[in-house]
Regions:
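Secretory-pathway/membrane protein signature
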Residues: 1-174
Length: 174
């Protein structure tokens, strides 16, 4: 469920997480909102929230009945899937920064031990991802924006960010 404006960080994060955890997810219109969204996103309050849900309220017969419980409706697998979607969303919000490359032009990766040699087993696609990531670190794009441009889940970039920061190839833009 999008926020009233539909373009907040929570909207972007929710779509990104669901794209990678449930490719068949459904995007509802703001006009399909429930009472929480009506209150939190109302003019004058305008909290920029989007809603992530496994099944939309009111769209299953057990909704708001005694059967809407941990036995009949909510399964351990469903609860775990919801947990991981929300955890990933919170991680993205916490780690979403802008990064800037610290050198002019493409950095020389070999001297930093980051470019594969004949004796290393780094897959070529990892090198391509690293170089493409660096090319987008202009200080203007956030991590989630870069992930979207690279068509990868944001969480698959966390180790790369740490590696490049540790080698002082990129830094966070404050």
């Amino acid at each position: 469920m999008p926020s009233r404006n539909g373009n907040t960080i929570s909207d972007l994060v929710a779509k990104h997480v669901l794209k990678w955890t449930d490719p068949n997810f459904h995007i509802y219109s703001w006009l399909d909102r429930g009472s929480d969204e009506r209150q939190y996103c109302a003019p004058g309050i305008d909290l920029p929230i989007a809603t992530i849900m496994r099944t939309k309220y009111g769209e299953y017969p057990e909704y708001h009945t005694s059967l809407d419980d941990l036995i009949n409706v909510v399964t351990p697998q469903g609860l775990n899937g919801g947990y991981w979607a929300l955890r990933r969303a919170l991680e993205i919000i916490e780690k979403n920064r802008k990064y800037k490359v610290s050198v002019m032009c493409e950095p020389q990766m070999g001297k930093r031990g980051l470019y594969p040699s004949l004796s290393t087993k780094t897959p070529q696609q990892d090198v391509i991802l690293m170089m493409n990531f660096i090319s987008l670190c202009d200080g203007n794009c956030t991590l989630i924006e870069i992930a979207e441009k690279l068509n990868v889940p944001t969480w698959e970039l966390y180790d790369l960010v740490n590696l490049l920061e540790s080698h002082k190839i990129i830094s966070t833009v404050e």
